[in-house]
Amino acid sequence: MSAPEADLSGWVRDPFTAEGFTYDVYRKGQGPGVVLIPEMPGVHPGVLGLGNYLVDNGFTVAIPSLFGTPGTPARGVRLIPTLARGCVAKEFAAFALNKERPITRYLRALARDLKSKTPGKGVGVIGQCFTGGFALAAAVDDSVLASVLSQPSVPIAISPAHRRDPGMSERELAVIEKRAAQDNLCALALRFTGDPMAPGERFRTLKDRLGDNFEVIEIDSSPGNTGGFGRIAHSVLTLEVRERDGQPAYEARKRVVEFLRQRLT
């Protein structure tokens, strides 16, 4: 059994401009809104498979194409240029500490736009890998009621300080901390235990600040783990999912849907 994948069938492409950026956004579904930010190398078939899963579970999904070529498989040498561009692009600030990333302002605007067009109390935002932390930074805007951080990998973990960094500025984190206390803003974070790109120290930083409003799912990827995950397991909600009950990544995907329903409906 392989990871669930899909193509662009049924997705409506529309450019969306905000905060000086314009990206194509792929939309599909009916119900409460979810911004699904793709992982590297972009809107690959695994991300589209996750998008269809959310649509099938009653959500309107908007996927901004921030990098890469939509529909391109997440493998091969074609990955390298996309990764390289992402690491040096100013809007992502991949190595910066205590940084408000310009792309998060765009994502907040997209969340507001989606909220204006969908039912529900607000919208959810899912970030993955390179974009994992952007999902929580987007929650500075009160249109966002639920953030899902799947294997958040920015800033890239090149030092102890980078591993501890929450992936946003102190100003942003203070706003989110206040929203958690006053508005019951909640976040769900996921990682594999052996994944050095999504360090556990980052989760501990956020847990210390947000307390019970920061739910953590850590999937065992140590040698001999019962899920059969390899030592480089990384993509919790896409590449490592096998659609059978009890498979840990599939159960994590189910929890994401449950979490979004709890927060948005």
Named regions from a protein language model:
Residues 1-265:
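N-terminal cap/leader regions of alpha/beta-hydrolase-fold enzymes
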